[in-house]
Amino acid sequence: MNRRFLAGCAAISAAAVWTLAPAAQAQKKADWLADGGDPQRTAWQRNETILTKDTVKDMKLLWKIKLDNQPRQMHSLFPPLIAGNVTTAVGPKEIAIVAGVSDNIYAIDVDKGTLLWTKHFDSTYQEPPQTGGRGGSTLCPGGLTATPVLDQTSPGKYVAYVVSWDGRLRKLDVATGEDIEPPDLFVPPNGKPYALNLVNGVIYTATAQGCGGNPNNFYAYDLATKKVGNWAPGSGGMWPRTGPSVGKDGTVYAGSGDGDYIPAQQIYGQAMIGVKQNPQTKALELKDWYAPSNAYWMRKRDLDFSASSPIFDYKGKEYLVSSSKECRIWLLDTSALGGEDHRTPAHRTPLFCNEEVNFTMGVWGSLATWQDAKGTRWILSPFWGPKHSRFEAPIEHGQVVYGATAAFKLVDDKLGKPTLLPAWISRDMYMADPPVVANGVVYAYGSGESTTQRWPEPGHAGGSAGRIQESTHAVVYALEAETGKELWSSGDQITSWNHFSGLSVANGRVYIGTFDGMLYCFGAASLPARASTMPQESR
């Protein structure tokens, strides 16, 4: 196994470690253990105390670090996961775990902006020869495609679960990068799993695009028995950016892509699907589903489900929200996703973008949700392209051309039914991607990527090559959560863009990775800045 460990300091004595332990416990830090922050994929950091809507205006670049990951197609780095209180041989550390598409994992000391260890996975999969050296296609890049998930197993002890390109589940010690146990096959090799989830000792993922000739399935890996369960929708794949979400009863949710919707034949394309692990057999079984009333119309126009679906409680009931490239939000009661006919949502919003019915526009990525101090439930959605001309919010921050973040409030209408009301629309963002929220501040960003999908033509390359040439740079924005007012932006500090990645936030820091392998850490003015731009050398 090709593994490099950067030792930099000698180990301290056991007595010194014991002495530091009480201090480490007293200074409890927040975690960000999964893509989207939690198993429900809310993208809400509940434990942020350093950055506030009053102090975020002074946020600065604390550091940036160049990682040696090689891009594949348009993929590069995935959103960092944050282990806030890791016990290491040299004392407690806050560590960021970053996955790279080329089967790489990096551990970074966030206080210093330096690399602690890195691991490149061995592989049982042999890649066939490719022209161009970046994998098969934008949809099927090959490599590691699922953001890992972390688990705190005891105070100071964290485990990282990772699925490598060959489909094997890896279990790593976050402090050292060492394998805790041998890898075990979870999903077929050379597929395209999305961000991992972990609930009650079970790892979940979903796959899409039929990459590597593999079926599009939900997958579950039971850690206690090492049994794998799967369930197939019989049609379109599931491609929620931040992975499937899990409800309080263990049901796993993801929307399926373009495909036939014929439930009588167990074919569930163009639908929101809930599956659940059988506790005896460990198999995944269909629990419920919802298909929009215009599912066939959406399928013909490639407007399929395209976003991870946050789950939350509202007045004693559990709901999820989701969206698609059509650009409206569905509110679904998880006790009966689509009612008796599987076609009736609890509520659906009007269209708020994609008036042109363009399959490259609409909602992509993930929604977010949070609750303010007054108990109001908020829903956030990124979108690509202009705002719909018939959609209005009470607060709007200028013309939207390339994309924005839209906010909705969940309230009861006159009949007592839950309803999503528009609250605000942010400033224009170049291809707005999934927001995260912490302590009254929404962190949103424009990815800067070119989303134009076309064949080669005179003067323009096609496919990934053309999109890479035309992409610009990402910009992160801090917005007041209740109004959408811009409080801060990264401006031109980020020099590259990203594709199908995201933000992470914890303990006064906001992280974003880019196509060129650079990881940026912006943070509170009270935190020390240790800018690092040179590639980190292994030793």
Model-derived features: positions:
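Bacterial N-terminal signal peptides that target proteins for export
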Residues: 1-12
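C-terminal segment of classical bacterial N-terminal signal peptides
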Residues: 15-23
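Polybasic, low-complexity, intrinsically disordered segments
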Residues: 22-27, 536-539
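Blade/loop signatures of beta-propeller domains
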Residues: 27-62, 81
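Extracytoplasmic/lumenal domain signature
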Residues: 49-74, 87-92, 103-142, 150-158, ...
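General structural concept
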Residues: 78-84, 96-98
